[in-house]
From Swiss-Prot:
InterPro entries: SurE (IPR030048), SurE-like_Pase/nucleotidase (IPR002828), SurE-like_sf (IPR036523). Its EC number is 3.1.3.5. The gene is surE. Binds 1 divalent metal cation per subunit. It comes from Methylobacterium radiotolerans (strain ATCC 27329 / DSM 1819 / JCM 2831 / NBRC 15690 / NCIMB 10815 / 0-1). A divalent metal cation binds at residues 8-9, 40, 93. Pfam families: SurE. This is 5'-nucleotidase SurE.
């Protein structure tokens, strides 16, 4: 099995090294094509107005001056060419990608791009807690990752579907199992704007998530990681809401 590994945190990210370890438990044919720099939050953007710069880091490892989606396209269509990957793994992201995070995430977008190209694709993320990004428990993803991916592949991924996996903020031995969970929803009041002024008196802003408490919905990915379970959430490319489609069709037919 040929595996293409990518991420949105960049070629030097510790989560990428973790995912390479996971991939090598599954196959000895692993290729890495990742962004040259951190591309967190770029979602499914493509570099249409800038050239893509490709740098070979080592054998079967490449860095791209571009987005995660650029990396998947370049990896599949140029680097691997006629012998494309059987699986795209994206991550391991530095921080959870749950609830509406999936709409912003470059990690999810890379898996989405793989799915568009007809390749089985899985996004993996490691949650962090009060200790922040500097205290991520990568061993959680490292220990459980290959087993979860293997089970997903054995179960099967239908065309048009990608799978989002999140590992909880705990030691590997403290994981309370796997939860197949729906995408959750946060209160967007948790998104804060930090207004500042630079040395020349000009305003600038940072977007951040406020550290406020909220109650995650039952059966959601948010609830799963809060309970120290690994969340597995199938996502689909088709964003059509069928009930609303039917309701609108009836309304406009009148």
């Amino acid at each position: 099995m040929r595996i293409l590994v990518t991420n949105d945190d960049g070629i030097h990210a510790p989560g990428l090294a973790t995912l390479e370890e996971i991939a090598r438990e599954l196959s000895d044919d692993v290729w890495v094509v990742a962004p040259e720099s951190d591309q967190s939050g770029v979602s499914h953007s493509l570099s249409l107005n800038d050239p893509l710069r490709l740098r070979q880091v080592s054998e079967q490892r490449f860095a791209v001056k571009g987005t995660p989606s650029d990396c998947v396209i370049l990896g599949v269509r140029h680097i691997l060419g006629d012998h494309g990957p059987d699986l795209v793994l994206s991550g391991v992201n530095r921080g959870q990608n749950v609830a509406e995070d999936v709409t912003y995430s470059g990690t999810i977008a890379a898996a989405m791009e793989g799915t568009i190209l007809g390749i089985r694709s899985i996004a993996l993320s490691q949650a962090y807690g009060a200790g922040g990004r500097g205290a991520l428990k990568w061993d959680c993803a490292r220990t459980h990752g290959a087993k979860v991916v293997r089970k997903i592949l054995e179960t099967g991924i239908e065309p048009g579907i990608l799978v989002n996996v999140n590992f909880p903020d705990c030691e590997p031995a403290d994981v309370q199992g796997v939860a197949v969970a729906a995408q959750g929803f946060r209160n967007q009041a948790l998104l804060s704007i930090d207004a500042r002024v630079d040395g020349r008196g000009n305003p600038y802003f940072w977007l951040a998530f406020a550290k406020a408490r909220f109650e995650p919905g039952h059966g959601s990915d948010l609830k799963a990681i809060a309970e120290k379970r690994i969340s597995v959430t199938p996502l689909r490319l088709d964003l059509t809401d069928e009930p609303t489609l039917t309701r609108f069709a009836q309304a406009f037919a009148e």
